[in-house]
Regions:
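Active-site-adjacent loop and "lid" segments of alpha/beta metabolic enzymes
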Residues: 1-37, 52-138
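Short acidic capping loops at alpha-helix termini that bridge into adjacent secondary structure
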Residues: 41-43
Length: 138
């Protein structure tokens, strides 16, 4: 999983030249290290670390440009469930969590852009929404 800095300081003004390109390069490098250490590539999933050392805008940019991370050829794990970025997007600058509805919306957006592994808290709500999204997609 990608994380800028360490947990105590990761949210203090995180800066990237290009958040998606920077994280793609990090994940590609870590994938190479894991494979070189003997882990079969087909057993590896990549996690861009939504909410870990990223601003609200960084998190949404990662979802918008998910195809650039999918180009690494591995399944992506997206964990946007209950993230403070969702609450902040919806107008609460002091949010420490996001609502279930916002979490489901973010999961559907990630799914529609190719995420195959979603880390969620409210499983039933996500399954229902993703079932509908899959039916619409055909």
């Amino acid at each position: 999983m990608h994380m800028l800095g360490e947990p105590r300081t990761m949210q203090i003004d995180p800066v990237y030249e290009d958040v998606v390109s920077d994280i793609a390069a990090f994940l590609e490098e870590r994938l190479g290290v894991a494979v070189a250490a003997g882990i079969p590539e087909e057993r590896i999933c990549l996690d861009p670390g939504i909410g870990f050392g990223k601003t609200v805008e960084h998190n949404f940019e990662l979802i918008r440009r998910l195809d650039e991370l999918l180009a690494l050829g591995r399944p992506l794990v997206i964990g946007f469930s209950r993230k403070s970025s969702l609450g902040k997007l919806l107008g609460d600058p002091e949010a420490t969590t996001g609502s279930v509805a916002a979490s489901v919306g973010a999961a559907v957006a990630a799914y529609e852009r190719g995420a195959t592994i979603l880390r969620v808290h409210d499983v039933r709500e996500h399954v229902e929404a993703l079932t509908v999204a899959a039916a619409v997609a055909g």
